[in-house]
Amino acid sequence: MKVTFYGTRGSIPVPDREFVQFGGNTSCILITFSTGRIAILDAGTGIRKLGNDLLAASHEQYDNIIVGLSHTHWDHIQGFLFFKLANDPRRHITLAICGKGRATKDLESVFATTMQDDYFPVALDKIGAKLTFWQPDTSEYIHPRGIGIVASKHNHPGGAYGYRITEGDKTLVYCTDVEHGDEIDSNVVALSKDADLLIHDAQYTP
């Protein structure tokens, strides 16, 4: 399992020189599995460059892509409008929030709203790729390709999900926008236990 960071910022992208070390794009992570298959976590502005890189690679395994969303606040979905693979009719893209408490139709309506003509010139139903909105109502899921997914809700206004992704003996945990409050969120602790890699933001730390 290989992890590539395409966006590490929150709230808004930042172009200023002092942010060059970690980049200026909002949340977007690429996971490349041992089979060569990929998954994307969050669709912030970093997904624009990620899409360009995937097009340049032109690999058939990129025709079916899962984009797992922690939540749908703007900085986690704003790049999807500029994700070039979404305009390619050869692609099948699954947009997903795994975990209990959010309906698939709600997820689709969020994207449809952001692409209304008041905000964007291309409507969701006119986008080129085949889109699937997927929200299994479970906290644990085994993908047919043998990837284990555990989703856990954590403290954030409007709710957000962390993901524990396991391939073979390697485990990645992705928890962003976590607001621990006076005590550490016990859900995050349980989700992260014995992980090989924890991706956790530091925006809300003292």
Task: Please place each PLM-identified region on the residue numbering.
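DG-centered beta-turn motif at the end of beta-strands
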Residues: 175-177
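Cap/insert and terminal regions of metallo-dependent hydrolase folds
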Residues: 179-206
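Binuclear metal-dependent hydrolase catalytic cores
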Residues: 1-173, 189
